[in-house]
Regions:
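Terminal transmembrane helical anchor/hairpin motif
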Residues: 1, 115-202, 206-216, 234-263, ...
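Long, hydrophobic alpha-helical segments
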Residues: 2-25
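Selective transmembrane-helix segments that form parts of the transport pathway or gating/packing helices
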Residues: 36-65
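Hydrophobic alpha-helical transmembrane segments of polytopic membrane proteins
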Residues: 74-99
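Central hydrophobic cores of alpha-helical transmembrane segments
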Residues: 101-114, 265, 287-300
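Internal/C-terminal transmembrane anchor helices
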Residues: 225-232, 273-314
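Membrane-interface segments at or immediately adjacent to transmembrane helices
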Residues: 305-388
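Short, structured surface segments that line ligand/substrate-binding pockets
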Residues: 363-401, 472-502
Length: 535
């Protein structure tokens, strides 16, 4: 499918235009009485015919087995359109260089360039911005990464084609229009036409004497020199930092700026001068390139300083209530939950926690050197905002929470809201007006269990909801809840949920109902009822 189209698009481009990479062969071919555009399209159509012939052979052989042409024709159309795009992109890469080994490097680099840049930005932000967490790549990044975008659109569980073992498996009940597969192919084919027009123009203007050079055009030299210097300097610089300064400063909430600058500057110099030597085919390149390399190094150092100083205000940003569609919260010593924009009380409580964490960080109370906190505990908090414009903002903090601190008060206020009290007690599907039809109480300590009748399950379920509404649920984040020895499950017609008895307060109605049920007896592993005497 898509992966094979990606591979053969690059390999065929190398084979078809290999004559451009050798001075003798390009001199011979270009001495023939043929226009360059004629040579260009002859090679292109030859490669496309080779790819299509193989696909047609697969279809003909498959027809002998399944005899159903419809799905096979869908597969043929999809794979052919994907191959048109990747062959066009490989052709463009072959026009940009005169060195055969540079073609696959350019081909892979162009396919993943935007994604690689975004990943470097995320890594740099995670090193310098307190609590920063990288989100999924946005739609723009995915569209600029064709092989990933097409693979997602065409090979997922609801896509057009699923390729598992090297040959296409097409299901008759899979619609080729699901997930915008045809639209994505149409867009990339239109882009392929533009790419081929650009490649043809470059082929006409290409200088034959530059065959064998890494850059087939003079303007490609600074692009490659500074592009490799920038990407390589940042990537290798962060890797070097992680294995040197990073290992010695594991408890820092941010990267050590002087160490990061040293690593980035060193790797930028290595990558930039190394690329200059490759482009110039000489070791004597310092006089011609040192000014641009120093400027690039200073620029990357300035970027690191700006990210460390949080010039854009990324670290301090707390989205406004009007911008929030929902917030997903993960917190140690509490269950995960999601608050929607309709629940303004919980939203405001979460925003208060976010502000309290930042204020505590501003005061310097984020030391991670010790595992123990006086009169408190380290709490891990992860917040994922889904905003109304479709974007997302994610933060994760490991902070000391001390009693009487603003953060302690903010977390406890969030835990006392109705939605959070519900998520602490109930896991699964639970609604206040639902009618249970049964349930089970299981002792993890002895292995005994008790099956609940519909009436017993309903009384237990109602008691739990009353405790949630009346606030008979622990709302202190530093309270040790320990482990529960009872597993309580309640089920209805089309739903089921579990009760977490750890979070009920001592006077909760739910605990009283459970105690009454257990006094009436258990069923052991043999199905026999055992009555427990009152203590």
């Amino acid at each position: 499918g898509v992966i094979m189209a990606f591979v053969f698009g690059g390999v065929l481009a190398m084979a078809l235009y290999s004559y451009l990479m050798n001075g003798r062969s390009v001199g011979l071919i270009h001495s023939l009485p043929l226009k360059r555009q004629t040579l260009f399209f002859t090679q292109l159509l030859t490669g496309f015919a080779m790819l299509t012939a193989g696909n047609l052979l697969v279809v003909l052989v498959s027809l002998l087995v399944c005899g159903e042409p419809g799905p096979l024709l869908v597969w043929l159309a999809v794979v052919t359109l994907a191959e048109i795009f990747f062959l066009a992109l490989g052709t463009l890469c072959a026009m940009l260089t005169g060195w055969l080994l540079a073609v696959p490097v350019l081909y892979v680099g162009i396919n993943f360039l935007v994604m690689a840049v975004m990943q470097l930005i995320h890594w740099l932000a995670e090193l310098f911005i307190y609590g920063y967490q990288a989100n999924d790549f946005g739609s723009f990044t995915m569209w600029c990464t064709p092989v990933v975008q097409l693979a997602r659109r065409l090979t997922d569980s609801q896509g057009v084609i699923a390729e598992y073992v090297g040959y296409p498996i097409v299901s008759a009940d899979v619609s080729p229009l699901e997930n915008g597969g045809w639209q994505a192919l149409g867009i990339y084919v239109a882009v392929a036409v533009a790419i081929l027009a650009l490649a043809c123009m470059l082929c006409i203007r290409r200088r034959s004497e530059l065959s064998g050079d890494v850059a087939a055009f003079p303007w490609m030299r600074p692009v490659l020199r500074y592009g490799v210097g920038c990407m390589g300097g940042l990537a290798l610089g962060m890797i070097l930092y992680s294995v040197t300064f990073g290992l010695a400063r594991t408890n820092d909430i941010r990267a050590y700026l002087p160490g990061m600058l040293l690593c980035v500057v060193l790797m930028t110099l290595v990558c930039s001068f190394g690329m200059s030597m490759l482009l110039g085919k000489s070791l004597k390149i310092f006089r011609r390139t040192w000014k641009g390399t120093v400027l690039l190094t200073a620029l990357l150092a300035a970027v690191c300083v700006c990210v460390r100083m949080d010039v854009a205000g990324v670290e301090r940003r707390v989205p406004k209530t009007s911008e929030i569609e929902s917030i997903s919260v993960q917190c140690s010593r509490a269950n995960s939950f999601t608050a929607t924009s309709e629940d303004t009380e919980t939203i405001e409580a979460i925003r208060a926690i976010h502000r309290a964490v930042l204020d505590q960080m501003k005061d310097g109370d984020v030391d991670l050197d010790g595992a123990l906190v006086e009169d408190g505990q380290y709490i891990w908090i992860r917040l994922k905002y889904t905003l109304t414009d479709g974007s997302a903002l994610e933060r994760a903090y490991n902070v000391p929470v001390r009693r009487a601190s603003a953060l302690y008060t903010a977390i406890n206020h969030m835990m006392s809201t109705p939605q959070v009290r519900q998520t602490l007690v109930f896991s699964g599907e639970a609604e206040a007006g639902a009618v249970p039809q049964g349930g089970t109480i299981y002792s993890l300590e002895t292995g005994d269990f008790r099956n609940l009748t519909a009436a017993e399950a309903q009384s237990l379920y109602q008691a739990a909801w009353q405790d949630v509404e009346e606030g008979n649920v622990i709302s202190d984040i530093l309270t040790e809840t320990g482990y529960t020895l009872l597993q309580v499950d309640i089920n209805g017609r089309n739903w089921d949920c579990a009760l977490d008895t750890r979070y009920f307060t001592d006077g909760a109605k739910t605990l009283a109902v459970l105690d009454r049920f257990m006094r009436n007896g258990w069923s052991n592993a043999d199905g026999l009822t055992e009555t427990t005497e009152d203590s």
